[in-house]
Each structure stands twice: as structure tokens, then as C-alpha cells.
Amino acid sequence: MNSANWMTGESTLRSSAQETQAARVEPSAADEQGMAAWLPDWMVRRLSRWNLPAPLALAMITLALMGAILSPLFAASGRLGLLIPGAILGVAGVVIVAKWRILGLIALPIASLMVRFAIGTGSQTGINAAVILLCLLLGLWLLDMIARERQIRLLTYRPVVASLVFGVVAIAAFGFGQLPWYATRSAALPAQFGGLLIFLLSAGAFLLIAHQIRDISELKWLVWVFLAVGLVFFTFRLFPPSYRLMTRIFVRQGVLGAAFYIWLVGLALGQALYNRQLARGWRILAGILVLMVFYVNMRGDGRFWISGWLPSLFVVVTICLLGRPDLGVFAIGLGALVLLLNPQVLSGLTSEGDNAYSTVTRLEAWRIIAELVKVNPAFGLGMSNYYWYTPLFPILGYRISFNSHNNYVDIVAQTGLVGLLVFLWFVAELWRLGWHMLSRVPEGFPRAYVIGALGGLVGTVVLAGLGDWVIPFFYNIGLEGFRASMFVFLFLGGLVAIARLYGIDPGRRDEAQPG
């Protein structure tokens, strides 16, 4: 072969090799482009401003670290073999929820009420599926703001501001809880962190829905899924032979939480009475669900458990008064007549069952906790600590640890009078916003939701006085109780979401008209 032919042959070989290499590279590049197209841009884009890797890489690193930290717990419980499949499912869940955020939102009721999975913490409570999913959604929202919007921007609605202040007060109270207020042991640090987590997740659930609902249809999906799960559960409750199957499907700590009932009643009754755009059959079914809740919770000895039905009764009266004042006045008059003719009904609230003993012990517990808090009335004793201080003051002659069974007393004991005032401010601002929205939101689902949420807010205020149902106390209902209490803050966040979607703000004179 002469030099010319040799050079030509070499050129041909090089060209062929380059084409082959290109042919090998092109599919992987196309695959990479397709993967990037399937994922949100902000997940695969490097955070150059902070010199950090892409959020997806950060999420995988975080999962790896969590796996390393939690592996001893899995090994101790004999579940080490679940760690790798769990990590794979976790990464897949992160990707899916990041792409379709609405799937994560509507999965919250299902995870809360039907998914038993929980990560053990070595204490009396574990990190359940509802907490994990909510933390994932909050983390993705935060990463979205950092990576895509390049700033953390929150709504300026007063309830949003109040919820943020409440979180700050809880963190400050946690700091005060590290001080030795009494010459005895305080709560273990994991228990204090658990108590703080409940406070912060409550505010986080509210902020998440307020900001992440992007269209009224997404809120509809969240409500319909919640009501559907509730309907299935109470259908089981109507038929005792099905209880064994029911206990396999539903998580006891979720479906027996009283907050679950008041929001079922509030949202279902609001849609049944005032959403005239909803088909009549669905409205009737929503009304039947309300009747089922009252029937199941008041039959037999259930009437002794007033947390199961009394707050829901306040929800019904409030919804009737807001939407149909004449109907509300009639309901109140009818109820007053029943009480006049049957005064034993009212006295039975505190005397039937174990209510008499419960009333006496609770009043004494509140008196003792008031004495304990005197050392720091402004910010309280910190998260979960008062439970270990109570034996210093005998209750009915016994030196035992106890909790208050009252959210207002709990808030004062853990975050002081400052925490209670901020919580009441949060509630007042929500009522003010909802009242302002009544005449400004469109008919149909939005207005029915606002009325139902205001009814739920009143029921929540009543319920908080009957137990730690709204912000669970770590040593009583605990993180497992957050499965139900989360709904309070999710659906109150929906109230702010509707205000945002329709441009309603009591602080502005020139509001956007509902479209």
C-alpha cells in the first residue's frame, strides 16, 4: 500500500471509529436528555450560587446518610433486609413526588390513616409514614424555592406570619427547656426533639398546603380523597362483623383521632349543604357520611367519649349559622329545647361513664401545672419537660407523672403564655380571613370549603380544650397522634390557599375579583 492509500485508509478507519464512538455516545446522551426532561429542571441543575450539587443528588446523599444512621435500628429490629429496598423506594418516591407534587399531597390522608410503616426511635413512639411523607414534601418545597426561585418567598397573609412566629416561639421554648428549672430529671433529649417536631410539623403542614396548592382542582382532589377514606372507614364501623378486616386496613391511632372526625364533618357538611355545583347524589352521600360519624360515635357507650361528638356538634351549628343563619338559629333553638326538657343530658357530660373522675383529675392537674409554670411563665418549661416535674406536686395524694389532657394547658406548660397568645392569634387571624372570604369566593366548591373550614376551626378550638388532640403531647398521644392532628393544619392551610388563588387579602383594599 502506497503512502497515499495508507493515509486514506487511516482516515477512513478514524472516520469509522469516530462514527462508531458517536453511535455509542448518542443513545446515552439521548437517554440522559430524556431523563432530565422527565424530571423537574430544578432537581438536576447544580446549585452554583451556593456551590452545591443538584437537589436530586442532595436528596440521594441525605437518604444514604439516613440509611447509615438508621441501619443499627433496623438491625436491632431484625429488619436490616428492608433497608436497601426501602432506600430504592425512597429515591423513587422522591422523584415521583418531585415531578407530580399533587400525588404527594393527596397521598397524605392515605399515609396517615392506612399506612402502618414507622421507623422505630427507641422510645415509645416512632416516625410514622405521615411524618415521613410530610417531611419529604416540605423538603422538596424548600429545595424548589432554593433551586428554582433562588429565594425563600412566603405569603404575607397574617395567619402565615402567625404560624411562623409560633414555630419560632416553639424553638425558643425548646432552648429554655435545657435549663434546670427543678432539681429533678427532665425529659430525655429525643423526647424534647419529638415534642418540638410536633409543633414544627403542625406549622409546616399549614404552610405547605397554603403555598403548594396551585389550582382549586388540587384542593378538590385532597378533599375528595380524604372524604373517600373516611367514608370507607365509617362504612366498616357500621358493621361489627367487618371490624377484623377494618383493623388490618386502617391505622388505629389515625382513625380514632378526634381531629379526624371534626374535619370529616366540616368538609362533608359544607359540600353537602352549599356546593350546588356538585351532583345531587354526591351531596346526599356527603350528608350521609356526616350522619354516620354521629351515629357511630354516639351509639352505646360512645356517648361518654365527648371528644368524639361534642366538637363535631359545634362544627354543624357553625356551618349552619354561616351558610343559612335561619337554619342555624333553628338548630340552636331545637338543641336548647332538648336540654330544657332533658337536663340530665347536660349533666351527663361530666357525670356519666368515667367523666366525673376525669373532670376532677384534670382540674387538679391543671392547678399543679400552673404552679410548675410559675418559674418561667413567659416561655414555659420546654418541650415535654413538665411530665417529669409533675411528681414534685402530688395529685390526689399520688406522686406520679401525668399530662394535662388539654392543648391550651399543654401550650402554656411547654411554650409559656407567649406561645398561647401566639396560638390564639393564629386562630383569630384564620377566622378573620375566612369571614372576609365568605362574600368574595365563588359559589360551589370554594365557598362550601370556606364555610366547612370555619366550622372545622370552631370545632378545633373546642376539641383543644378536651385533650391534646390538636398538638399532641409527646408522652400521651405523641407522634402517632399526629396522623390525625395533621388534618387540622392541612385543611386550615387550604383556607389560605383559596384566598391566594382568588386574590383575597383582608389587608388589601383592591382585591382581585374571583374568577
Task: Indicate residue ranges for each PLM-predicted region.
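Transmembrane alpha-helices of multi-pass inner-membrane enzymes
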Residues: 266, 314, 456-515
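A membrane-periplasm/extracellular boundary helix in multi-pass inner-membrane enzymes
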Residues: 47-56, 122, 168, 235, ...
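Long extracytoplasmic/lumenal interhelical loops at the membrane interface
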Residues: 349-367, 379-415, 436-441
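Alpha-helical transmembrane segments of multi-pass inner-membrane proteins
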Residues: 2-68, 88-93, 164-175, 199-208, ...
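Hydrophobic transmembrane alpha-helices and their immediate junctions
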Residues: 417-461
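Membrane-interface junctions at the ends of membrane-embedded or membrane-associated helices
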Residues: 145-153, 210-222, 275-279, 324-327, ...
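Membrane-interface micro-motifs in multi-pass membrane enzymes
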Residues: 78-83, 125-128, 191-199, 249-264, ...
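N-terminal hydrophobic segments of proteins, predominantly signal-anchor/transmembrane helices
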Residues: 95-195, 447, 460-463
